[in-house]
């Protein structure tokens, strides 16, 4: 309240009043289209998920992440990175395919708790509610472009995957100073997903963490801003590994690293990022951040909007597959996670919708006209995802553009 920091559009999708065909529905439909065309995402106020269910899901997540590593690693998926994944000690996540369907979600229980566990029921119920919400939003989108005939085919061509995330709390006993580091301009620069910085050289913010121990200095006010020689390896943008099903994330493997010398003491240079900037590969994602903020979304103007968590609020975000399907009319925004609160563990849950394997994504002809010439060639989502794992896919400023952009000339 009263804050002038930029915010995402907030749209009320509350069940009580939103009935198809009602005047509220028509208004929400145009709000959804406008928000997505402008930002590729919006905040949604919802009442479909009770506080009780939210609490149960949080408890289930805490229980899951507290399992011994060997148990967590049983959450495997034939595709790499789609199961349990630990990212440089900064975050860890589980993946649950078809989390909204009870029988399928039970496969996840089998992996982690062969003796059975009631938590999965809560997670499944939660996924079911978010899936209903997601389908409503995708229905609103297609209606808003006047392609109602396509709704059933579209909804039937997709499935869901849930991702549960824990961002590990940073300790409190370090001194930090923000510094800017310029890395060479080149193909790798935009492995952080930032396609807009190519011409100016990519500037990345890195954080110098100095562990002030007795052996270094008793004085906590060490001035590390002076004489710190930062050597940030350009492998900051080493390579990105996408989630195997392509639904969501590009993780940087081998994050920002380098050394800074402070007197005789070595300090680690590390990204503050819990999750580097990326676009989701999915059609859509619904993200719920529990109490601790961290999610930031990039606007078309290149500004980062930090999304504040609220109990009955989720974020709807468009992915590359939706961008392609909608002939580029809806962008898939870059977003990242920066957990700035110390000593606080951040939990987040996201439900992604993906096109089924074998389904060809092709913009309906109604979305193509003189003002909007066809932007992408038809493709199978699996192929987009596989391309993402190639060197060329990783280096591309925009995976989607490089893979199937009409201007890519392939
Ligand atoms: O943790 C979050 O808030 C977002 C996670 C995310 O962007 C992803 O999993 O693709
Ligand atoms: Fe994401």
From Swiss-Prot:
Which keywords, in A-to-Z order, does the entry hold?
Answer: Dioxygenase, Iron, Metal-binding, Oxidoreductase
Q: Which Gene3D superfamilies match?
A: B-lactam Antibiotic, Isopenicillin N Synthase, Chain
Show the SUPFAM superfamilies listed in the entry.
Clavaminate synthase-like
In terms of Pfam families, this protein maps to: 2OG-FeII_Oxy (PF03171), DIOX_N (PF14226)
The record's remark on the cofactor is: Binds 1 Fe(2+) ion per subunit.
InterPro entries per UniProt: DIOX_N, IPNS-like_FE2OG_OXY, IPNS-like_sf, Iron_ascorbate_oxido_reductase, Oxoglu/Fe-dep_dioxygenase_dom
Q: Which GO terms describe its molecular function?
A: dioxygenase activity; metal ion binding
Chain positions recorded as 2-oxoglutarate binding sites: 346
Q: Which E.C. number(s) belong to this protein?
A: 1.14.11.-
Enzyme category, top tier: oxidoreductase
Which metal ions or organic cofactors does this protein require, according to UniProt? Fe(2+)
Q: Where is the Fe2OG dioxygenase domain?
A: 258-355
Into which family does the record put it?
Belongs to the iron/ascorbate-dependent oxidoreductase family.
* Role played: 2-oxoglutarate-dependent dioxygenase involved in glucosinolates biosynthesis. Catalyzes the conversion of methylsulfinylalkyl glucosinolates to hydroxyalkyl glucosinolates.
Q: What is this protein called?
A: 2-oxoglutarate-dependent dioxygenase AOP3
